[in-house]
Amino acid sequence: EPRSVDQVTDYAIIVGNGPAPSSQLLADLLAAEPLLLCADGGANTLYRLGHCPAVVVGDLDSVDESLRQTWPTSKWVRVDADDTGTDLQKVLRYAEAVGIKRAVLLGVTGGRTDHTLWNLTLLSAFATQLDLCILDDDCLIRRIPESICFAAPVGLTLSLCPLSGDATGITTKGLRWPLTDEALTPGQRDGISNEVTASPVEIQVGQGELLLVIQRQGAGRDLALIRATAKQKDQG
């Protein structure tokens, strides 16, 4: 039985309409009893994986209509197709409206390249409202707005990718190729395939935004990184 949207929680799993996560990955995440939401056709994915969402959000043009009878306890939120944004944006707005503060996005990478690229930009677009990360069976992706510190095993591969233009004033600790008040520039200076040499890893950013792309480490360490508090820049 899924957690009801009326039950108090600030943590959600959101399933998109892209390539499905493994059943094991989803089961690991659901052990923490988050609110389970899906964006339109993500409902079909959840059905195939044997899970029932609390809420389905979108224009509902990609959902198997029989699921309304299969899931009588689920809430269905139809947002007009004319409303701006993708179904994933619509479910993120819904999550914010019901008090979600932190969410893991599944089924939003792979498949169509344009969808994957757009979904990555949502980590920035919703940064002031939601602490988001993207997870698939290979890696975890999250935005580093200013600084983050997390435990990681020695030898783990991670990458730092500028999200929107230059990222400057970057300083790292615990990596084979450290950065000290340096810049990463799209198409010029990259932060691809670095390696953990000491734990915890610390990453600080002066200006701009970075994406942290890190190999999955197993359920326990994945959840720790999902919960890691990234210090936000002053929005004032």
PLM regions: where:
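Long, charged alpha-helical interface segments
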Residues: 144-236
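Class I SAM-dependent methyltransferase SAM-binding "motif I" and its flanking Rossmann-like core
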Residues: 115, 122-153, 158
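Short N-terminal binding/cap micro-motifs at the start of the first secondary-structure element
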Residues: 21-24, 45, 221-222
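N-terminal nucleotide-binding beta1-loop-alpha1 segment
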Residues: 2-19
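Short beta->alpha connector loops
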Residues: 18-21, 42, 61, 140
